[in-house]
Amino acid sequence: MPWIQIRINATAKTADKVSNMLLGRGAQPVTFMDAQDVPVYEPLPGETPLWGETEVMGLFDAETDPAPTIAFFQQIFGEDVGYKVEQLEDKDWVREWMDHFHPMQFGERLWICPSWRDVPNPDAVNVMLDPGLAFGTGTHPTTALCLQWLDGLDLAGKTVVDFGCGSGILGIAALKLGAARVIGIDIDPQAIQASHDNAERNGVAGQIELYLPADQPQDVEADVVVANILAGPLRELAPLIAGHGKPGSLMALSGVLESQAPELETIYGQWFDMDPTAVKEEWCRLSGRKHG
């Protein structure tokens, strides 16, 4: 059946309130969209990452009269509240979503493939990964930068720390590329579960250890450390992240905008000889080799 979509303009502070109001008026589901195409600056753990200007979108049955809902938001936020009402044609939305994702190649050897697609090269290093709740499918420039970096390493027999593991994509890729052991760390229990499920799907669950920050091992001496968690946490957690690598280990950081790269390069330069910065779109990857 067709649908009616109501978009309400919100701020980072009001987006959750608007979402709850739309749900209360019968929207199923509610989604968030960046209203100005600006990047999200990831906050520290416990904070909610949202854009400064956010569109909150509620999907309603076609028979729904949008006028009372619009009037409700005008009463709460004023007559000039930004909104848009759209009629959406009936589609197989699951199929539409699935059609958006295709196998992607990173570097020379590595492919990330949704489970419903044929593997383009059976002889390549193939990671089977479906989009889900946790961050990391290969479509975002930061993930792509890290995957390309991993593809260029000799990981045979190595221990890898994936700090902010999300979907587990980087750690799983490292294992498929020859690493012997991966330690994945994330603040989100959903990410830990997603990483576990994806590792099982790829036959590497026995080689990946997954921890919330409070449970992470303290005596790790990894050969490779990768952290794709954005600038704020990279800055605050720098001593911890750097400490996971043994002398001579390799490190890659991403989730960093070009404007943020110089500060982080200076911070991590205390422990690492830094490589030239890699840039994809407006995002950067910093990498280096640990002193000693």
UniProtKB/Swiss-Prot annotation:
Q: Which GO terms describe its cellular component?
A: cytosol
EC category name: transferase
Compartment(s) of residence: Cytoplasm
What does the UniProt keyword field contain? Cytoplasm, Methyltransferase, S-adenosyl-L-methionine, Transferase
Q: Where does S-adenosyl-L-methionine bind?
A: T143, G164, D186, N228
Q: Which family does it belong to?
A: Belongs to the methyltransferase superfamily. PrmA family.
* Catalytic reaction list: L-lysyl-[protein] + 3 S-adenosyl-L-methionine = N(6),N(6),N(6)-trimethyl-L-lysyl-[protein] + 3 S-adenosyl-L-homocysteine + 3 H(+)
Record protein name field? Ribosomal protein L11 methyltransferase
The record's annotation in InterPro entries points to:
Ribosomal_L11_MeTrfase_PrmA (IPR050078), Ribosomal_PrmA_MeTrfase (IPR004498), SAM-dependent_MTases_sf (IPR029063)
UniProt GO molecular function? protein-lysine N-methyltransferase activity
Organism (species): Aeromonas salmonicida (strain A449)
Chief localization: cytoplasm
Q: Does the keyword Protein transport apply?
A: no
Function of the molecule: Methylates ribosomal protein L11.
Matching entries from HAMAP family are given as: Methyltr_PrmA
UniProt-listed Enzyme Commission number(s)? 2.1.1.-
Q: Which SUPFAM superfamilies match?
A: S-adenosyl-L-methionine-dependent methyltransferases
| Taxonomic superkingdom | Bacteria
The biological processes this protein is annotated with in GO are: methylation
Q: Which gene encodes it?
A: prmA
